[in-house]
Design a protein with these regions (language model features):
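Glycine-rich, acidic/polar active-site loops that bind/position phosphate-bearing ligands
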Residues: 1-280
Length: 280
């Protein structure tokens, strides 16, 4: 895990992926091996959110096609293998003043600004209700469990990888907020809209965040929906998100996901047969 040498096994595949990305002008930064078996992390350079969503969309298609050429399958499923870490799409966000080019998350003296804290407050207040937008499938919620390198709540902290909202170590101009809740299975366009909408509401309403989590956030309670059905209910009950994202979009999205959830509920899992068939 986290090894440059571990990537060598996949050198032919990744050389081809890099070639494709260069030709498509996708701004890929680094590639490292992650904790899971055959799990890789790709980082993109910072960019305009819409342009970056375009890049992520094309990158996913590129990786899948390149993998097939090497007799492999690439998946962006949130939790494809039990007992292995899931896959996320962490989104780092900062806001730049168009007139001055200054990062509004930092004061002139280099300290964190009120806008920085209000943005975090908005993420904490609204991410639970917006969860279904970035955890769009029943499998998405299997990733979000204790001690699996995925968050279970929306605590925030500086360089704390157990929280849902992290502020990485950086210079004042590069101060940013990382949303660690979003899964690799999320639509990048919807993910960008979701996290920006939550942060925007925090700025608009001057929402103060909870005190910073200094320790292990896994010791704190769950504060995110535990299933697709629960997440759908939470989004339906949040009028502020309806207003920002559009009522028609929220209605159509939740109705489609409700149909998918209904189909899932018709499936009887092997776990249920193993534990219940001859024991109840």
């Amino acid at each position: 895990a986290y090894s440059i040498d571990a990537v060598n096994e996949f050198d032919p595949l990744f050389e081809e992926i890099y070639d494709y990305c260069e030709k498509m002008e996708l701004n890929v930064d680094t590639l490292i091996h992650e904790v899971g078996a055959g799990q890789m992390e790709i980082n993109f350079f910072h960019a305009h959110p819409l342009g970056l969503a375009d890049e992520v969309f094309f990158f996913k298609r590129t990786v899948r096609e390149a993998a097939l050429r090497h007799d492999m399958y690439a998946t962006f499923m949130a939790k494809p293998i039990a007992g292995e870490p899931g896959s996320a799409m962490h989104v780092h966000q900062s806001i730049i003043d168009k007139k001055t080019g200054r990062n509004i998350f930092s004061n002139e003296d280099g300290t964190a600004s009120e806008a920085f804290h209000h943005y975090i407050g908005g993420l904490q207040r609204y991410i639970p209700a917006a969860m279904v937008l970035v955890a769009p499938y029943v499998n998405s919620y299997r990733r979000l469990s204790r001690h699996t390198a995925a968050p279970i709540n929306i605590e925030w902290g500086h360089d704390n990888r157990t929280v849902g909202i992290r502020s990485p170590i950086s210079t004042p101009q590069a101060r940013r907020v990382e949303n660690r809740v979003i899964g690799a299975d999320a639509n990048p366009y919807v993910a960008m809209a979701m996290t920006l909408a939550c942060g925007y509401l925090g700025l608009k309403n001057k929402i103060k965040p909870k005190p910073e989590m200094k320790g292990d956030a896994y010791l704190a309670p769950y504060s995110l929906p535990r299933s697709l059905g629960e997440a759908l209910d939470w989004l339906r009950r949040e009028p502020d998100l309806h207003e920002v994202l559009g009522k028609e979009f929220v209605t159509i999205y939740t109705e489609i996901k409700e149909l998918e959830f209904d189909e899932f509920m018709k499936v009887i899992s092997p776990w249920e047969r193993e534990h219940l068939l001859l024991h109840v």
